[in-house]
Amino acid sequence: MAPNLRKSHPLLKMVNNSLIDLPVPSNISAWWNFGSLLTICLLTQILTGLLLAMHYTADTTLAFSSVAHTCRNVQYGWLIRNLHANGASFFFICIYLHIGRGLYYGSYLYKETWNTGVILLLTLMATAFVGYVLPWGQMSFWGATVITNLFSAIPYIGQTLVEWAWGGFSVDNPTLTRFFALHFLLPFMIVGLSMIHLTFLHESGSNNPLGIVSDCDKIPFHPYFSLKDILGFILMLLPLTTLALFSPNLLGDPENFTPANPLITPPHIKPEWYFLFAYAILRSIPNKLGGVLALAASVLILFLAPFLHKAKQRTMTFRPISQLLFWILVANLLILTWVGSQPVEHPFIIIGQLASITYFTILLILFPIVGALENKMLNY
């Protein structure tokens, strides 16, 4: 009998073990769709980004015009740009839901998978940041200036570091050129990290909503979950195309329709919506270094998740108090996102400070305490 090429060919064998014959817990819900959705996001972004890069000029005098030219004169250039800009938003929606799923169902106990995931998040944030600078509008320029300037808060080497990153004494042509180079490079780094992420995941196998060992009840990925994932693709690509075709500038900043001008500062400098929660935490601390540390901690705190797990049960499925706390955390993040978009004045300052304190308190103090409390409750 001829050998099955899918199972014997060195390359096809890897694809087969990852996407076809992969044993998957039979009870995973739609919350497990986001890994494949993120893959689709990444591929879409790389494809549209490559097409945009063919028409883009990384020069301060030409960048803005080259983007306008792409939208006006290139065949479907407007669509490619709108898909790329809004695709970033959907990328972040998916990754935040993916992380939320991981926190809720205790997936962070697969430490290697979780840690590579957090590194992926940081890389994605860096990619989105440098990408936002490329159109060279007002918000691009001032966003780059404000965020890179934060590194000057690092004692002793800060100022040198910032000037080294800028390639001069202010954000200028060298900065734009290197940001374009980085924006082109980082997505491929994300692809590599995703493969590592997937390798670690397939070492242990997927978690499931019950958080119990599922070795006795697994089914092949194809056709069951490959088909289920296609539903997810449709449910994501439909709103993405709707947004890109009907309201492409809904999530953008009107300031970015004005070419960058170092002599005029916009009244409210703020990042894209997906960074607002971290931006609100940064702004809530009046000290520069303190703000930078809080900003870093707001994301790096995810590395601590496995060590803060004190519950005997893995998931929150049967832990009602932890569930309540989790949804309070979600609401808190939405409040932070809203506050980050508002001007720095009363009452937004105090709301931001309270929400920032709540964010760290829930993650660092309340989750472990409630986990231990629920362990006690299991004994009664």
From Swiss-Prot:
UniProt: a ubiquinone binding residues: 202
Note on cofactor: Binds 2 heme b groups non-covalently.
SUPFAM superfamilies with a match to the protein in the record: a domain/subunit of cytochrome bc1 complex (Ubiquinol-cytochrome c reductase), Transmembrane di-heme cytochromes
Cellular component, GO annotation: mitochondrial inner membrane; respiratory chain complex III
Binding site for heme b b566: 98, 197
Annotated signal sequence range: none
Family classification: Belongs to the cytochrome b family.
Described purpose of this protein according to its UniProt entry: Component of the ubiquinol-cytochrome c reductase complex (complex III or cytochrome b-c1 complex) that is part of the mitochondrial respiratory chain. The b-c1 complex mediates electron transfer from ubiquinol to cytochrome c. Contributes to the generation of a proton gradient across the mitochondrial membrane that is then used for ATP synthesis.
Protein name: Cytochrome b
Gene for this chain: MT-CYB
